[in-house]
UniProtKB/Swiss-Prot annotation:
Subcellular location per the Swiss-Prot or TrEMBL entry: Secreted
Keywords from the UniProt entry: Amidation, Disulfide bond, Ion channel impairing toxin, Neurotoxin, Secreted, Toxin, Voltage-gated sodium channel impairing toxin
Disulfide bonds: C11-C62, C15-C37, C23-C43, C27-C45
A cellular component annotation (GO) from this entry: extracellular region
Name of the protein in its database record: Toxin Tppa2
Free-text comment about domains: Has the structural arrangement of an alpha-helix connected to antiparallel beta-sheets by disulfide bonds (CS-alpha/beta).
Family of this protein: Belongs to the long (4 C-C) scorpion toxin superfamily. Sodium channel inhibitor family. Beta subfamily.
Amino acid sequence: KDGYLVGNDGCKYSCLTRPGHYCASECSRVKGKDGYCYAWMACYCYNMPNWVKTWSRATNKCGKRK
């Protein structure tokens, strides 16, 4: 699947201050084929396994208490 990587806090992986290869490295770490820093804000990955958590507007938990 394709999508934005999310951390344990439910927020997208930020790439604003990261080196150019950061997102591609993070995407390959979860067995994705490739990735990039979308609009210099968040890592977007391609061809990841279905078990990888990705950000969704419907299930967004970023910044919210559990």
